[in-house]
């Protein structure tokens, strides 16, 4: 049974978890803006200073595989329609380089400014972390669930959670921190240039 977290709560990951499926889901509210919503999940592999060490430490729809294959994005869902996970990221903890101390899992709205969209128009957003046996196991056993209940009226990017290493143990931090400026703002925040 999964542990349900609230914003700011932290929990240790199961010691036996070698691979994790990170599933993200959401619904978009109907509105009369004329544009479809395209939300995108991404992951940033971070060093001790909270910054990416290399460009390939940024995993998103144009770079699906992170360094050493440690983090793999399962592809961009352009509509977010349907039940269940809208986008999935798989983490293989055995492949994460030693210098990586944290993985930030984020969601952004593609072309948010031009489309006049923000996270205030998104509902039922969640993240779940499941223990999986291999990269083909897309169900797994849920360990953690975090429902984002906060209202984000102007934000176009969210840091949903951080999976971080402390004293050799991987932990989960329910962050839910909003940004204006979309993906570009997150990229700069994590030490990369656009």
Question: Could you say what each language-model-derived stretch is?
Answer:
Residues 1-194:
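Intrinsic-disorder/low-complexity signal
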